[in-house]
């Protein structure tokens, strides 16, 4: 069993007109970035006016960073404050404050992830099963067919890609395939790293799987009732999972023990009412967002 934790309602962020699909914490800051079905890319500073509490009303105002022409499925922080965004229609945008958005069209299938690869390139996963590599100037460097179905998630610094073939692929720094193995069935939707460097995956089968670097299964947990959409690891030793079953769960990143369930039963007025699609940590604060259009912030403590 892991150490007991306490989860308190901190605040909620409202303004998106459709479901939220992506969250990002900007490095070394209290700022999170959100994006979703309305195409809006929004910045929220959780520490702008000091600690924010639920009572009486949400008091963090979002700042529109960019309005894109179609739903945004993924975000990545680039160099020097640049934000990268991938869309439903195969567009990758490079967003720089004070400048017009730049973009490259990679096809017509959705962009499900953008990740910094081991060699510094930018890896992009497409619904077509293609893995695309770009440089920081949006120049196309390479593209290859990896899966027969969508590529859904990536740990770029480890060379790992998961997808709707139910597989995890391991590639080298140059993008050459080293190995692959079966994981969540039929689809792997999210990947994370635990405290020991093992791989954690979640997917349509609602299972959390802990695997070694070679794909050997170490632990398997029926973590949720429905599809697991998101995983987020904390430097403080926690792993959060978010699911179509409307719950967020917090696990011990060291041993996989379940520490807390966040749902409408325990938090009647603040738990998610629809699918949870995205998660990110800001220190002890956990941000969760989904189809109810609201970003909910939770304070986690021991």
Where are these regions (language model features)?
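Conserved strand-to-loop turn within each blade of WD40 beta-propeller repeats
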Residues: 35-38, 86-89, 125-128, 162-165, ...
């Amino acid at each position: 069993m892991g150490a007991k934790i306490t989860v308190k309602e901190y605040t909620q962020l409202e303004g998106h007109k459709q479901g939220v699909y992506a969250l990002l914490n900007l490095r070394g800051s209290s700022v999170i970035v959100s994006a979703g079905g309305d195409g809006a890319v929004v910045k929220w500073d959780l520490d702008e006016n000091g600690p924010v509490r639920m009572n009486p009303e949400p008091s963090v105002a979002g700042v529109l960073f960019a309005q894109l022409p179609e739903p945004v499925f993924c975000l990545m922080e680039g160099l020097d404050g640049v934000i990268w965004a991938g869309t439903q229609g195969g567009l990758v945008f490079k967003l720089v404050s004070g400048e017009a958005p730049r973009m490259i069209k990679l096809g017509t299938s959705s962009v499900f992830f953008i990740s910094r690869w081991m060699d510094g390139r930018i890896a992009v996963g497409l619904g077509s099963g293609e893995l695309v590599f770009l440089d920081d100037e949006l120049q196309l460097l390479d593209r290859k067919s990896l899966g027969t179905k969508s590529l859904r998630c990536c740990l770029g610094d480890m060379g790992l890609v998961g997808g709707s073939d139910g597989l995890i692929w391991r590639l080298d720094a140059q993008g050459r395939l080293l190995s692959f193995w079966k994981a969540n069935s039929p689809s792997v939707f999210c990947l994370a790293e635990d405290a020991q460097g093992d791989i954690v995956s979640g997917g349509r089968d609602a299972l959390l799987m802990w695997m070694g670097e070679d794909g050997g299964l170490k632990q398997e947990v029926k973590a949720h009732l429905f599809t697991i959409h998101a995983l987020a690891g904390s430097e403080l030793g926690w792993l959060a999972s978010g699911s179509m079953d409307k719950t967020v769960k917090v696990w011990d990143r060291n041993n996989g023990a379940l520490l807390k369930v966040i749902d409408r039963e325990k938090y009647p007025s603040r738990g998610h009412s629809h699918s949870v699609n995205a998660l990110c940590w800001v220190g002890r604060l956990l941000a969760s967002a989904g189809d109810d259009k609201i970003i909910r912030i939770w304070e986690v403590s021991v």
